[in-house]
Structures are given as C-alpha cells and as structure tokens.
Amino acid sequence: IFFQKKIKKIIPTEKISEVQKTLGEKVNSAKVGDLLVLDNIYFKNRSPIIVPTSRAVLYDLLCALEDNPNLKIQIQGHICCQLVSDYEDISTRRARAVYVFLVQNKINRKRLSYKGFGVSKPIHPIPEKTEAEANENRRVEIMIVEN
C-alpha cells in the first residue's frame, strides 16, 4: 500500500501571472509551424493520466487559447526510454488527455488536434544517458497550426 502526502504550495498571484504571461508571450510570438514544449506536464508511469501537479501548466495553456481565439494547435505526445515502438500508443493517449482537458474547459475542438509520435522524435538519443535526458524526451509539445 502506498500513501501520498498532499503538499499545498502557495504561489503568489504575481508569480502565476508571470508564468501565464510567459506562455502567452510564447504563443503570441509563435509562427505557424513553431513547436512549443509544455514544461512540467507529467503523467503516471505508462499511463495517460495527468498528475495533479501538472494542472497549472494545463490552465496556462487554456488561458493562452482563451486569450487568442484564432489560435489553432496540434498537441503532440512523445515518450522516452524505449527503442521499441509505442505499442500501447501512450504518446497519443497522453496528447489526447491534454486535448480532452481543453475541450472539457470549453475550447472548441475545431481549434485542436492531437498526435502521438512515440519515440520517433527524441531530443536526445535513445537510450538516454541520464534521467534529465529521459524527462526531456518524455514531453508534450504544441505546434502552432494557425495564429
């Protein structure tokens, strides 16, 4: 049996707006075809379930989409660590989890698409040499389709 300790972290309002502003600025200055890595989105191991600590990043993306009504994106999922194909299609399921979050929060699905790339587009060669490299390969990106 595993127990989880809930830790409440209070983030000052001005810090939250800085994070949102940063993502919003990235989106505003992005051109069609640009890729933006969504840092700090984590999933349960071999699962499309987003861990609760990742919610802040999802809400930042939601705000960026609400602030840019003409913005259309493709959500791209990537996995790490395996040279074999993504047999469980986890990368697609993770990208879809982000898509579902946005649709459930009233973003028009016509503005969104999603795709999984498995291990086909790593940042670092596989197998990774460090956990940091694995974390960078295990990511969600958004590609600007229209802005």
Residue ranges of model-derived segments:
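Periplasmic peptidoglycan-binding/tethering modules of Gram-negative envelope proteins
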Residues: 1-72, 131, 146-147
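Periplasmic OmpA-like peptidoglycan-binding domain that tethers envelope proteins to the cell wall
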Residues: 49, 53, 78-147
